[in-house]
Amino acid sequence: EIKESITTHCLNAAEKIRAESLTAKTITISIRTSPFQNKEVYYSNSKTIDFPIATNNSIEIVKAALTGLNSIFKKNYRYQKSGIVLSGLSDSENNQNLLSTTKDNKIKKLMKSIDYTNHKYGRSTLSLADAGINKKWNIKKEYSSKIDTADFYFLPIIKAS
């Protein structure tokens, strides 16, 4: 499940930076167990990996993340949280790869097609197999607030008297 969550985080982050025409030079992967479980040992770790060339390719980002995850993952722990951070962001138009190939252009077209399909038919319509299908690890929607607090106009107004 931890592998699925890291993969899903990577796919979402890669899609977002492509939408902003950005590339990332570095990825940081983090995992942890619950600090509140008294019966279990707390474990937290992270790994930072630099890409040879800044990228927004989902496949490269997931591959690097899973390599990092394998280096910090310990068996027999109940992980509660995982995350990734893409950093060293730069404009993808300014990233000049002198070794750019036909393969790179095909990957760009593939990523664009995946983003288009997911935008049209819903997130994760097209995904990598490592992201899983059931996503048992995902946040339970029944525990989420029904109020959209991401929109400023839906926030409650409090008046002090």
Whereabouts are the PLM-identified features?
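Basic, low-complexity intrinsically disordered segments
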Residues: 1-161
